[in-house]
Amino acid sequence: TDIFARTSPTHKLRLVTALQARGLTVAMTGDGVNDAPALKRADAGIAMGLKGSEAAKEAAEFVLADDNFASIAAAVREGRTVYDNIKKVISWTLPTNAGEAMTIIVALFAGMALPITAVQILWVNLITAITLGMALAFEPTEENTMRRPPRRRGEPLLTGALGWHIVFVSALFLGGVFGIYTYATDRGYPVELARTMAMNTLVVMEIFHLFFIRNIYGTSLTWDAARGTIVVWATVATVTAAQFIITYLPPLQRVFGTQPVPFLDGVLIVAIGVALFAIIETEKQLRLRIWKRGPE
């Protein structure tokens, strides 16, 4: 740690500029007129709200209302949590939508009957996907959030790792939906039942993917991760109940073109969701291990 005492406004400005020249993101706190140039130059200029001068407040981007430095760390923590939750929503939504699109495209090019009807796709997109996706907006801060280094300046939200995740999970969704649909048709099930199983498989995979995506920087195989939050379990319970209703309630069966799914086939659908979770969690742990070894 380097300490500079009794520095002039010019020295403060040079320190900020020198750190930025090394590619660092610089935060500067100050309360006086002599701090204004450095506050203006810093990436995050923070002026004292109670004891700070008007010049410092005008030059800074942020004003610390309570003059408590602990509030800076709390603000960084909150900002990282919001950013992480936005990234989680995107990481969860895009593979789901891409998997649905790929299912339809592959079926059309192969000249097959659609594994999921248009009404069922609307149900998945407008009801289950939105309901489950909303839970990620209320996710608490992950344990290692404040121990992570800051993001690189200018780093895009859609990174290469996220792009790979979208492609990888979309392919698994495609395989799961087509796999269960092919299984049902090979057993001589009516096409309505095969489509019902395909739709429920898609929703079950969404649920297991939700539990996976809640921890994008660490393992999902912990008690805290499995326990989830009230919001997560409320949305999962709501979606599960809705799926049972449209699958087994006769009036809605006519609307959505569904048929009751036999018990053992329902177990198979859940097993596909478990398999999805196991595969993507294993891939994440391998990727994180390789990433940690990268700088060595």
Language model region names:
Residues 1-28, 47-218:
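Membrane-embedded transport module
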Residues 1-34, 40-44, 80, 86, ...:
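Cytosolic catalytic headpiece
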Residues 38-40, 57-58:
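Structural signature of FAD isoalloxazine-binding scaffolds in flavoprotein oxidoreductases
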Residues 117, 165-166, 232, 265-269:
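Residue-level signature of transmembrane alpha-helical entry/exit and packing/kink sites
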Residues 124-128, 201-209, 239-246, 272-280:
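Alpha-helical transmembrane segments of multi-pass membrane proteins
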Residues 142-149, 220-223, 286-296:
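Short, Lys/Arg-enriched, Gly/Pro-containing loop segments at transmembrane-helix junctions
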Residues 176-178, 238-254:
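Hydrophobic alpha-helical transmembrane segments in multi-pass integral membrane proteins
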Residues 222-230:
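Cytoplasmic-side transmembrane-helix entry/capping segments in multi-pass membrane proteins
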